[in-house]
Amino acid sequence: MNDNREQLTQQIIDAGRFLYGRGWSPATSSNYSARLDEGRALLTVSGRHKGQLGFDDVLATDLAGNSLEPGKKPSAETLLHTQLYAWSPAIGAVLHTHSVNATVLSRLVRGDRLVLQDYELQKAFAGVTTHEGQVEVPIFDNDQDIARLAGRVQPWLEAHPDCPGYLIRGHGLYTWGARMSDALRQVEAFEFLFECELKVLSLSR
């Protein structure tokens, strides 16, 4: 294992422990990845407990989502990671989490997007410099056909190049960043904002 792969794998392992510890990636849910080079990514192996990841729980894939390591099966949702790397060369890490807040809020919001507005913490997202604007988070209906789901995600990405993440209804959050630390920051920001939105909804009833 070369130094770069070892470092990126350790970042994925550390991310898993952190996200599991916060309750955002329970049991074997969720999947994480990091760009290895121009044509490859490292992803978590399917079905592994995210709070107990080791070096054997990460594998390399090409950007079509195909495993490059015989005997290791990538997550069924690998294509949702690799499409992001293919879409933007600036993306270096992708995190998919299954928190209670993201799951419940995605079911409560009517329509195809969540609009975050007037929150100071919006500035935690890459490229956002003020609380005064809107951050639109698209919500896609869950689909076991991942290629079909990716086909619905792609037009949104193309039309919204500053998009910081998206929700899958009743499922969870996808977010990303130039580095793993950036992606983790965005997960934290989303979770705070999702909790705020849920409290607003509960108090307004």
From Swiss-Prot:
GO MF term set: methylthioribulose 1-phosphate dehydratase activity; zinc ion binding
Involved pathway(s): Amino-acid biosynthesis; L-methionine biosynthesis via salvage pathway; L-methionine from S-methyl-5-thio-alpha-D-ribose 1-phosphate: step 2/6
CC cofactor note: Binds 1 zinc ion per subunit.
Cofactor entry: Zn(2+)
GO biological process: L-methionine salvage from methylthioadenosine; monosaccharide metabolic process
Statement: the UniProt record of this protein carries the keyword Ribosomal protein: no
Keywords: Amino-acid biosynthesis, Lyase, Metal-binding, Methionine biosynthesis, Zinc
Record flagged with keyword Zinc: yes
Listed InterPro entries: Aldolase_II/adducin_N (IPR001303), Aldolase_II/adducin_N_sf (IPR036409), MethylthioRu-1-P_deHdtase_MtnB (IPR017714)
SMART domains: Aldolase_II
A GO-annotated cellular component: cytoplasm
Protein family (similarity comment): Belongs to the aldolase class II family. MtnB subfamily.
Job of this protein: Catalyzes the dehydration of methylthioribulose-1-phosphate (MTRu-1-P) into 2,3-diketo-5-methylthiopentyl-1-phosphate (DK-MTP-1-P).
Full protein name: Methylthioribulose-1-phosphate dehydratase
Species of origin: Pseudomonas paraeruginosa (strain DSM 24068 / PA7)
Name of the gene: mtnB
